[in-house]
């Protein structure tokens, strides 16, 4: 599937995603500010309750499918026969042709470092070790600078209200699918679900996240088959270790002319003037949300 720049982008004007709340500022003056909405969404797979997630509520179909894929509850070759979303009961039901029963698996889960109750199941690591990422993909430094600029300038819930994470599927220097949510694992699951539902290939893509480069983020990126992960935030030690194990290119602290690559550095092509990129960042840089995290 061919995607254009920002095929999907945040919609800060959507009244369902933020609320206006009155309060006082540091000087005691009355103010009104936007705050991000958070609501429960209970996911069912073929009638079996899987999990209740806290989410902003957009793209529930993508979130549900991405979650199931990244938890190895939905196979890549599974035929999805239906996705039913009920906004009144805050539920989403994914139906597949294959019969499923994950009662035993649901009893064995690990809380992750992601906010909004992220979980990981034991067999995720087993499949992680079997993934082979394409080695011939390249990451030009000019793409890192271009992506950071475009993503930072894109209107978003982060800039409108804060308290949000963003994940962006990119190709070369073009941002394609930009998802946000209160938990970074929700945002990455939304992208994974969108890719699966729309038949988007992964081997030539770059994954950009605003969140930390944790083990969870590395595992999910590898599971999706994406060979490059970029963030403006920092790393965790286990995230770096897993990225090196999987030959995932891991780039963090990507701000202005600066970044650090701690894994998969053989894919880097240094083709940009870092000083020039820094000047661009000063002229077009992200100013932060109205209520920055």
Please state what every model-predicted region is.
Residues 2-171, 176-178:
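Intrinsically disordered, low-complexity regions enriched in acidic/Ser/Thr/Pro/Gln residues
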Residues 64, 69-70, 74-75, 116, ...:
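Generic, ordered loop/turn and secondary-structure boundary motif
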Residues 70-72, 80-82, 91, 120-123, ...:
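Short, surface-exposed, polar/charged, turn-prone segments marking secondary-structure boundaries
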Residues 87-91, 138, 212, 252-258, ...:
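A general structural signal for short secondary-structure boundary/capping elements
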Residues 98-109, 179-186, 223-233, 276-279:
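Short, Lys/Arg-enriched charge-dense amphipathic segments
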Residues 148-210, 216:
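A mid-sequence, solvent-exposed acidic-amphipathic segment
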Residues 185-273:
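Feature captures the catalytic cores and cofactor-binding loops of soluble hydro-lyases/lyases
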Residues 280-293:
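Long, low-complexity, intrinsically disordered segments
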């Amino acid at each position: 599937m061919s995607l254009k720049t920002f095929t999907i982008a945040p919609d800060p004007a959507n009244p369902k995603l933020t609320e206006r709340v009155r309060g006082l500022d540091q000087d005691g003056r009355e103010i009104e500010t936007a705050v991000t909405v958070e609501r429960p969404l209970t996911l069912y797979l073929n009638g079996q309750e899987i999990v209740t997630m806290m989410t902003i509520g957009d793209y529930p179909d993508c979130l549900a499918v991405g979650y199931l894929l990244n938890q190895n509850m939905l196979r890549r070759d599974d035929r999805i026969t239906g996705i039913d979303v009920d906004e009144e009961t805050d539920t989403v039901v994914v139906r597949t042709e294959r019969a499923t029963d994950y009662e035993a698996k649901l009893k064995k889960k690990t809380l992750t470092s992601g906010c909004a109750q992220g979980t990981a199941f034991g067999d995720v690591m087993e499949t992680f070790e079997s993934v082979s990422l394409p080695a011939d993909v390249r990451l030009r430094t000019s793409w890192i600078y271009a992506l950071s600029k475009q993503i930072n300038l894109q209107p978003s819930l982060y800039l409108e209200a804060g308290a949000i994470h963003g994940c962006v599927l990119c190709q070369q220097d073009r941002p394609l699918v930009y998802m946000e949510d209160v938990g970074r694992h929700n945002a990455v699951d939304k992208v994974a679900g969108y890719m699966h539902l729309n038949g988007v290939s992964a081997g030539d893509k770059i994954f950009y996240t605003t969140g930390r480069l944790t083990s969870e983020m590395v595992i999910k990126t590898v599971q999706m088959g994406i060979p490059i992960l970029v963030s403006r935030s920092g790393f965790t030690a286990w995230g770096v270790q897993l990225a090196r194990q999987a030959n995932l290119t891991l780039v963090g602290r990507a701000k202005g002319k600066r970044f650090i690559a701690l894994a998969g550095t053989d894919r880097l092509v240094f083709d940009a003037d870092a000083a020039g990129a820094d000047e661009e960042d000063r002229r077009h840089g992200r100013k932060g949300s109205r209520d920055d995290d």
